[in-house]
Each structure stands twice: as structure tokens, then as C-alpha cells.
């Protein structure tokens, strides 16, 4: 997201692309550019995945529909040192990483540094055009690590040497290779052959060092840090590795954490319980807020949800049971599945009625139309069998997410308040939050800020008014020049977007009206399309100087705003949504706002659908990032390589940090960040 104060005025005026690239040492700028990682969920006995033609619901299936995770990370902002107030070097897994991009994970994830294809190299496999004619441009490979063949997702990759601890039944058989993807396969094979050690589920990238976290409540074991910059050998032995894997086995999760500039991404997968957690934290004005979210929000969510979506006795000691009272949540019905969709609701709709001191927030309706109730009440079931055959109240799950976020921000502000005199910059730091929890066919989304969760689904092109509404949805985010082709695509059953969360930014008139209504005495509450002339987002985690006068007073005079009254200008009140998946839903794109500097919702869905059609085994998330870079380069008169030759920091003038996760609802997940 970057610092909201910075303004761009003629940064490229009169500058030739070649002159830009010649100012930098090309041999250094790709060092720490980003990383790729991959994960495949082991085959579990008795699991039957639904076919694309059949509805996702099945009473005997308790497993999620995701299958694998892959992606990449590229940063636009440089690495910024933590203030030192919220975490010491030993607490922060990224404190030792000089690079703007870093990655750490449990052993079942594998990662590689991300490198662009050299200029004029034969490594490039394109242009390759989709036979259907879809897509804005021919698909060309710009990175050495993608598209990725599905057989390379599993980690560790099959080896001739096996330890007694390995479980062959959990290792997926590799399909036959395709020549277009041999590059990535070769890179992985070389790494495995050079680092073939008898360690169970060892990451193919050797760690730089371990993070000796002092937080006893942290869920994860000591992390394996993978930086794109360093080639140092780690300090680890078999006993330490066995200890880590033993702890990971007890906690029964696989996890990955990545950073790209000021973006942070957190993925947690429970292989046995069948759920996936994804957090995207788009920071601004510094790294402390997104780092704090990365280290604490998932743990808070896990504590609040224990007893709702799962009831693991091994984890119960980590926190209290998060059961809460039923909140207000108007229900919608999907005519196709007969199951409830809980629309986007706001924080204050879910809290107990006794919380009178909370600022009154605007109530809004879902941005998609309300659907009529065509099913009998026997089919309209809000509850679903959980992992322990206990009913799940979706409203309570959403409330648990909200409580976890509230407690995390309260702890962050309390800790920062103790250090604000020594570190006044903490009052400026904040982050957007996008959290998605997926279990089976239930998807829960919590959002604060301008990140988006966009579902790609087949339109239900019925007759009459409903057909017209489906077609109107296509026009929603499309530019004028794209409307004709997109509408024609809809007539051919091209996927259409469904945004599951409300965006909290000054682009949304409801948000602007709310802030002005809460500050009638301040004519500059929203100025130059920014809250107090500073932030485009109208809700955020942290950013205390826009929430309380005391935080604003702690800043240096040059950074202070004219704070009028005592009411907060922004809040951390999230939008919450529960969506029940159906056979029409094909994939879900989770992204920070950087993606939508160059894409509309429809264009992003259209691009992913087109790419998957051309490369069923490819990485659509990395492809979206590549397209962002191509569009940014074209906008400023550069080519792909010239843009990447500009170092982080300077490159922020052309594009933002972008984090993208594409979850395929037909068996795969792809993840990328930039």
C-alpha cells in the first residue's frame, strides 16, 4: 500500500525508459526481487473430491475443496527496519533479512528465489495463445519459476533415499512432465540432488537461520526462513529438525509466511481437519503493524474459533473458547443450493447490544442483489456438520473473527502506547486486513481496508430479469472498451465476478458520507480523496493518529493533522461475510489493492479464466503479477525487464506491492505476492 503521504508528480516526465534502467546496477536489483513457493495437500484415504459438474455439497465429505498452493512474491517497496518497539530481533522472523522479500514455512512448503527470464533467452516458452481466443495478450513466460507443473508441488520431491518416518501414502504420484514446464522441474531437481538429506518433509531451500521466538503463545514452531538474498548455510542438525517436525505434527498444521515490501501474507493449512486460513496484510507507513498482524492475528483467530469450527484438545490450552452470542445477520438464500449466504456485515452489527461506547457504524447491504427464497425451510440450513459432528453457527464464526481482530488491535495499540514517546512513528503505522477462512464449502471473509475477495463464478443466465441482472453485473467494473467483449463472453458463459467484501476507501461514497456525518464540524475530514488528506482507506488496523487525539499529539509537528473533536476519523470495524460455495463457483482471488491499480474485478476474473484454459497446470496468481508488471511498464513507456531493473523504492512510483492468492474451487490453490 505504501505511505499515504507520498505524492507522485511527474516522476517519468521527459525520462526515457533506457535512461531509467541505466541508472542502476542490473546485477544487484534482481537480488531479493521475490520468491516462489509451492505446496500440495497429501492424498488422504477415503477422500472423494467432487467433480466440476456436481454441487460441492455432500454430507459424507468433510474435506475442503482445495488441493495445492503455489505462487510468487515481488516487492515494490524496500525493506524497512522495525521500530524496535514492538519486537526485538529475536521476535521478528524478518529482522535479519536485508532483502525486501522473504519467505518462511513449515517443511511441506518448498520455495525458490524468483528470477525473471533473461533478455532474449530461449527459456521463454511463448508467445502461446489460448485456442479460445480469450485473454488480453499472448501468454509469455517472464519468470523462470512458472508456469509450474502440478507434479512439482509436492514436497519433498520423490527421492531414492527414504527415511523410516516418511509416509509414502501421503506423497502424490507425479504426472507425466510437459515440455513447457521443464525449466522449473530442472531447478527443483538440481536443488534436491544437491541437498538430498534424510530429513522428513524438508524444505528444498536451506534456511538462513531460525527465529528464536520468545512468544510462548505463538502457534508455530521455530520457523525456517528463506530469503531471496542470501546463500548462507543454516545452523541446524537432525535433532533440531526432528523437534520441529514433532511440534508440527502435534499442532497438525502446515504454514507459510511471506513478505513483499510492506505486504505480509500468512497461509495455514490443516491437512487432517480440512481447512485453510489466509491472511493478507497490506501495511503502510512502516512494517510494524503488518508484522504484528502476521505474528498474532492467526493465533487469536485460532483461540476464538476453538469449539466452533474445530475442537482440538491439543490446542485448547493455547486460549479460551471463543463461543459468542448470536449477532445480527440478515440471511440470503442461494436459489441453486438452498443454503444461506450471510452478506457483508459490519463490526457493530455483530457485537453485543451492551457495547454502547462503540462508534456507530454505517449498515450496508451486500453489493449483489438479494435473492428470493425459492426453497423450503427444510433445505435452508444455516448449520453444517463440523469436524466433530457439532453444528456450526456461521454468525458465531464471523463474530469470532471480529473478536480476534479487535483483541489483536487492542493489544497492538496498548503495546505501542507504551513506546510512543521513544518511537512516535508507531502512531502513523497501520495496515489493511483481509482474512479468509475456508472449510469445506463454507467461506468466511473479514476485511478492513481496500483489499478484495473476488469470486469467479458461472453466470446463471436464466430468462427475464434474472438474466439481465447477471449481465449487468459484468458491466460493473469494466472499462468502456472492454464491455463489448466481456458481454459477449458472458453470453458464452464466461465467468463473472462476485465481490465478497466491501471496500473501505474514499472511492466508496457511503464511506465518505459516514466520515463526514461523524465529523460535522470538520470540513476537511475528507480532503483530496483522502481521510484528512492522508489515507485513501477509511478503515484500517493501527494508524492511531487518526483514531485518538493523543496519538496525533505524539507525532512530530510536520506529521500532525488538524484533529478536531475526539471522534475517530477511521476505525478497525471490519466487513464480514459468509458464502456457501456451489458448483457455479470456480475460483477465488484474494488480493491487496495493488492488483486493482491495473485490473478491474471482471478483468482479473477474465485473465485467470483465460490463463487456466491455456495452462491447466500453470500458476494464474503469478500470471496476474506478471500482467501487472507488463501493464505498469507499458504505461510508463518501458519494457518488462527495464521496469524490474529499477530497485525497490524507486519502483514504487510505477506499481505497488501486490499480494495475490488464487484459490481454485476445483481442486487447486495458487498464491502470489508482489
From Swiss-Prot:
It is found in: Nucleus. Residues 244-665 form the PPM-type phosphatase domain. Disruption phenotype: No visible phenotype. Its cofactor is Mg(2+); Mn(2+). Binds 2 magnesium or manganese ions per subunit. Mn(2+) 1 binds at residues 282-283. Signal peptide: none annotated. InterPro entries: PP2C, PPM-type-like_dom_sf, PPM-type_phosphatase-like_dom. Keywords: Hydrolase, Magnesium, Manganese, Metal-binding, Nucleus, Phosphoprotein, Protein phosphatase. The modification Phosphoserine is found at residue 125. The conserved PP2C phosphatase domain (244-663) is interrupted by an insertion of approximately 100 amino acids. Mn(2+) 2 binds at residues 282, 593, 656. One of its GO terms (molecular function) is metal ion binding. Residues 373-384 have a biased composition (Basic and acidic residues). Residues 153-175, 202-247, 373-392 are annotated as: Disordered. It catalyses: O-phospho-L-seryl-[protein] + H2O = L-seryl-[protein] + phosphate; O-phospho-L-threonyl-[protein] + H2O = L-threonyl-[protein] + phosphate. Expressed at low level in seedlings, roots, leaves, stems, young inflorescences, flowers and siliques. One of its GO terms (cellular component) is nucleus. This is Probable protein phosphatase 2C 66. It is an enzyme of class 3 (hydrolase). Pfam families: PP2C. Its EC number is 3.1.3.16. It comes from the Eukaryota.
Amino acid at each position: 500500500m505504501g505511505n499515504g503521504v507520498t505524492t507522485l508528480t511527474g516522476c517519468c516526465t521527459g525520462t526515457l525508459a533506457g535512461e531509467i534502467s541505466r541508472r542502476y546496477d542490473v546485477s544487484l536489483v534482481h537480488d531479493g526481487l521475490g520468491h516462489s513457493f509451492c505446496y500440495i495437500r497429501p492424498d488422504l484415504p477415503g477422500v472423494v473430491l467432487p467433480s466440476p459438474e456436481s454441487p460441492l455439497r455432500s454430507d459424507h465429505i468433510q474435506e475442503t475443496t482445495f488441493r495445492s498452493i503455489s505462487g510468487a512474491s515481488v516487492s515494490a517497496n524496500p525493506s524497512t527496519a522495525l521500530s524496535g518497539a514492538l519486537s526485538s530481533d529475536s521476535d521478528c522472523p524478518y529482522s535479519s533479512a536485508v532483502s525486501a522479500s522473504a519467505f518462511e514455512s513449515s517443511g511441506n512448503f518448498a520455495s525458490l528465489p524468483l528470477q525473471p527470464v533473461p533478455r532474449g533467452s530461449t527459456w521463454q516458452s511463448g508467445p502461446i495463445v489460448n485456442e479460445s481466443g480469450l485473454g488480453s495478450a499472448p501468454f509469455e513466460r517472464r519468470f523462470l519459476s512458472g508456469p509450474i507443473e502440478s507434479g512439482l508441488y509436492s514436497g519433498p520431491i520423490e527421492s531414492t533415499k527414504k527415511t523410516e518416518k516418511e509416509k509414502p501414502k501421503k506423497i502424490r504420484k507425479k504426472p507425466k512432465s510437459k515440455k513447457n514446464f521443464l525449466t522449473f522441474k530442472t531447478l527443483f531437481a538440481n536443488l534436491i540432488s544437491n541437498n538430498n538429506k534424510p530429513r522428513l518433509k524438508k524444505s528444498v531451500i536451506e534456511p538462513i537461520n531460525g527465529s528464536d521466538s520468545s512468544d510462548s503463545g505463538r502457534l508455530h514452531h521455530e520457523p525456517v526462513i528463506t530469503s531471496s538474498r542470501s546463500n548462507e548455510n543454516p545452523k541446524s542438525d537432525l535433532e533440531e529438525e526432528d523437534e520441529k517436525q514433532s511440534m508440527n505434527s502435534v499442532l497438525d498444521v502446515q504454514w507459510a509466511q511471506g513478505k513483499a515490501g510492506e505486504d505480509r501474507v500468512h497461509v495455514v493449512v490443516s491437512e487432517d481437519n480440512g481447512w485453510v486460513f489466509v491472511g493478507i496484510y497490506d501495511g503502510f507507513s512502516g512494517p510494524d503493524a503488518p508484522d504484528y498482524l502476521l505474528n498474532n492475528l492467526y493465533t487469536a483467530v485460532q483461540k476464538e474459533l476453538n469449539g466452533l469450527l474445530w475442537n482440538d484438545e491439543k490446542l485448547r490450552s493455547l486460549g479460551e473458547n471463543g463461543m459468542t452470542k448470536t449477532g445480527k445477520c440478515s440471511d440470503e438464500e442461494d436459489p441453486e443450493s438452498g443454503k444461506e449466504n450471510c452478506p457483508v456485515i459490519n463490526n457493530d452489527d455483530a457485537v453485543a447490544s451492551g457495547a454502547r461506547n462503540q462508534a456507530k457504524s454505517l449498515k450496508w447491504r451486500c453489493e449483489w442483489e438479494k435473492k428470493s427464497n425459492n426453497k423450503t425451510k427444510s433445505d435452508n440450513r444455516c448449520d453444517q456438520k463440523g469436524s466433530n459432528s457439532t453444528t456450526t453457527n456461521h454468525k458465531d464464526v464471523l463474530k469470532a473473527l471480529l473478536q480476534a481482530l479487535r483483541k489483536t488491535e487492542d493489544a497492538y495499540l496498548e503495546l505501542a502506547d507504551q513506546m510512543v514517546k521513544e518511537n512516535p512513528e508507531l502512531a502513523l503505522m497501520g495496515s489493511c486486513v483481509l482474512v479468509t477462512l475456508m472449510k469445506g464449502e463454507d467461506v468466511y471473509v473479514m476485511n478492513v481496508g481496500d483489499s478484495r475477495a473476488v469470486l469467479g463464478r458461472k453466470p446463471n443466465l436464466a430468462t427475464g430479469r434474472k438474466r439481465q441482472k447477471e449481465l449487468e453485473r459484468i458491466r460493473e467494473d469494466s472499462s468502456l472498451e472492454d464491455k463489448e467483449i466481456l458481454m459477449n463472453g458472458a453470453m458464452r458463459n464466461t465467468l463473472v465476478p462476485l465481490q465478497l467484501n466491501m471496500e473501505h476507501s474514499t472511492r466508496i461514497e457511503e464511506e465518505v458520507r459516514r466520515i463526514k456525518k461523524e465529523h460535522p464540524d470538520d470540513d476537511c475530514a475528507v480532503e483530496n480523496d483522502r481521510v484528512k488528506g492522508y489515507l485513501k482507506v477509511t478503515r484500517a488496523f493501527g494508524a492511531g493518529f487518526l483514531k485518538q487525539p493523543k496519538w496525533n499529539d505524539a507525532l512530530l509537528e510536520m506529521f500532525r493533522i488538524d484533529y478536531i473533536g475526539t471522534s475517530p476519523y477511521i476505525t478497525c470495524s471490519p466487513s464480514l461475510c459468509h458464502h456457501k460455495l456451489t458448483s457455479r463457483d470456480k475460483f477465488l482471488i484474494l488480493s491487496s489493492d495493488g492488483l486493482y491499480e491495473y485490473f478491474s474485478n471482471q478483468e482479473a476474473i477474465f485473465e485467470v479464466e483465460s490463463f487456466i484454459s491455456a495452462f491447466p497446470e500453470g500458476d494464474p496468481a503469478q500470471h496476474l503479477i506478471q500482467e501487472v508488471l507488463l501493464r505498469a511498464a507499458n504505461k510508463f513507456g518501458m519494457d518488462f525487464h527495464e521496469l524490474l531493473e529499477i530497485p525497490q523504492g524507486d519502483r514504487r512510483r510505477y506499481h505497488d506491492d501486490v499480494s495475490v492468492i488464487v484459490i481454485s474451487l476445483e481442486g487447486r490453490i495458487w498464491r502470489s505476492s508482489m
